[in-house]
Amino acid sequence: MSSHSHNGSVGQPLGSGPGFLGWEPVDPEAGRPLQPTQGPGLQMVAKGQPVRLSPGGSRGHPQEQEEEEEEEEEEDKTGSGKPPTVSHRLGHRRALFEKRKRLSDYALIFGMFGIVVMVTETELSWGVYTKESLCSFALKCLISLSTVILLGLVILYHAREIQLFLVDNGADDWRIAMTWERVSLISLELVVCAIHPVPGHYRFTWTARLAFSLVPSAAEADLDVLLSIPMFLRLYLLARVMLLHSRIFTDASSRSIGALNRVTFNTRFVTKTLMTICPGTVLLVFSVSSWIVAAWTVRVCERYHDKQEVTSNFLGAMWLISITFLSIGYGDMVPHTYCGKGVCLLTGIMGAGCTALVVAVVARKLELTKAEKHVHNFMMDTQLTKRVKNAAANVLRETWLIYKHTRLVKKPDQGRVRKHQRKFLQAIHQAQKLRSVKIEQGKVNDQANTLAELAKAQSIAYEVVSELQAQQEELEARLAALESRLDVLGASLQALPGLIAQAICPLPPPWPGPGHLATATHSPQSHWLPTMGSDCG
C-alpha cells in the first residue's frame, strides 16, 4: 500500500503535506506541527509520534527508531502539560526501585573491594615492602579510585530515594524531601565512605604505656592505621543490600499487608525476621565475622608497641578477642594501646549481647510446643490416675487381709496382722499424697493456658454468641410472621358464622314498588302468587 502526493487535498495520507485550508496539523502532546512524509510508506500515529512502516519490512529503519527513542526521552525529561497517570507513576516507581537496588549492589561491591585492597596493602607494607614503595602507592591510588566511585554511587542512591519520595507523595520539587534529618544522614554516610588511606607516606608519634611494666613507650606509626580501621564501617552497606534483596521487602503483597498493619519494612524488621527464621545461623555468622575483624584490628593497633609479638600476632589477637568475647579474661594477654583497649571493650559488649541471645535461642529451642505440652500433661495425668487406683486397691487388699487374719482364723498371728496394718496405713498415705499431687497437676494445667489459648476461647465464645443471636433474630421473625397469620385466621373465624348463615338462608327478593304494581295490574299475563312462610323467617 503506497501513498502518492497530489496538488489537491484529496488522497493525501495522514500527516503528509499541508492540512485542510492550508494550515498544518499540530501535535497536541509535543506542541509542534506534524512532520510531512519523505517517501513512500504507511505512516501510523501513536502517542502523537509519527512512525513510518516501509513496504519492505514491518518496522522502520534502526536510525529512525533511535531518533524516535531519543525524542521520547527528551519529552519525558521536559514533561508534557498532562498530569501522569497512575500506571505511569507505578511503572516509574518500579523502575526506580530496580535502579536503587542495582546502585546498592554496586556500592557494596566497591566498598568491599576497597576494604580488601586496604587489608592487602597493610599486610604487604608491614612484611614485604615499605610505605615508600611504588606498589604501596599504586594500591592506595586504587583504594582512592574505588572510594570516589563509592561516593558517586552513594549520591546516586540517595538521588533515587528522593525521586521515590517525590513519586510516592506526588511532589514536584526535590527540595521538599531534603529535611535536616535526611541531609544529616547523607552527610554522615558520605563522611564514613570517604575515610581511606590516602596515597603517600605520613607518620606520627604514637605514645602508649606498656601493660605489665607500666613503662611509657613511643613509636613512629603510619597515619594509615587511623585511616584504615574506620573503613570497616562500610559494612553497613551489607545490611542495606540484605534489606533491598529481602523477599519480604520486594513482595508487593507483603508490603501491602505491612502498610495496612502500620509495619515499616526496614533493616530492623528484616533482622528480626531472620532471627526468628534462622537464629543460629545469624548468630554464628555475626560472631565469626566480628571475631575476625576485631582480631585484625587489635593486631594492627598493637604492632608498633608489642615487642614480643604476643598481641601483634594474628593468632594471639584471635585468642585475646575470644577470651574477651566470652567474658573469661585469663589475663595472659592484654592490649597496650588505647586503640586495642577500645576494640576489646566493644568486643566484650558484643560478647555479652551475643551470649544473652544464645541463651534465649537455646531456651526457646528446648521449650515444649503447645501440642507437646498437652501430650505431656495427658500422659502425666494418666500415670497419676493409675497410681491412685493402685493405691486404692492396696487399701482394699490390706483391709481384707487384716479382716481375714483377725476374724476368719482360729489362732490369729499378731505379727502378720501388724504387717498388714502397716501396709494398710502406707497405702492410705500414698493414696492421699497422690490425690494431692493430682490436684496440683490440675492447677498447673489450668495455669498453663496461655494468652493464645484464651484468645482462641474468646473467639469461640464470640462465634457461639453470634450464632445464638442470629438464631434468636430468626426465631423472632418467625414469631412475628406467625402472629400476623393468627390475626388473619382470627378475622376469618369471626366472619365465618355470617358467611355460613348467608349461604344457608339467602336474602328474600325485594318487594315490588308502585311501578311494578301498575305494570302487574295492566298486564293480564302476570299473576302474583303469595309465598309460603319458611322456618327461616
From Swiss-Prot:
Biased composition (Acidic residues): 65-76
Record's bilayer topology term: Multi-pass membrane protein
Chain spans, region Calmodulin-binding: 381-460
Membrane-traversing stretches: 108-128, 137-157, 176-196, 225-245, 274-294
Matches recorded under InterPro entries: CaM-bd_dom, CaM-bd_dom_sf, K_chnl_Ca-activ_SK, K_chnl_dom
Expression sites (tissue/organ): Highest expression in brain and liver with lower levels in heart, testis, kidney and colon. In colon, detected in smooth muscle cells. Expressed in atrial and ventricular myocytes with higher levels in atrial myocytes.
Ranges where the record places region Disordered: 1-90
Intramembrane residue segments, as ranges: 314-334
Region (Segment S6): 343-363
Catalyses which reaction(s): K(+)(in) = K(+)(out)
Recorded superkingdom: Eukaryota
Keyword Ion transport: yes
Segments of skewed composition (Polar residues): 1-10
Function of the protein: Small conductance calcium-activated potassium channel that mediates the voltage-independent transmembrane transfer of potassium across the cell membrane through a constitutive interaction with calmodulin which binds the intracellular calcium allowing its opening. The current is characterized by a voltage-independent activation, an intracellular calcium concentration increase-dependent activation and a single-channel conductance of about 3 picosiemens.
Family to which this protein belongs: Belongs to the potassium channel KCNN family. KCa2.1/KCNN1 subfamily.
Protein name: Small conductance calcium-activated potassium channel protein 1
Gene name for this UniProt entry: Kcnn1
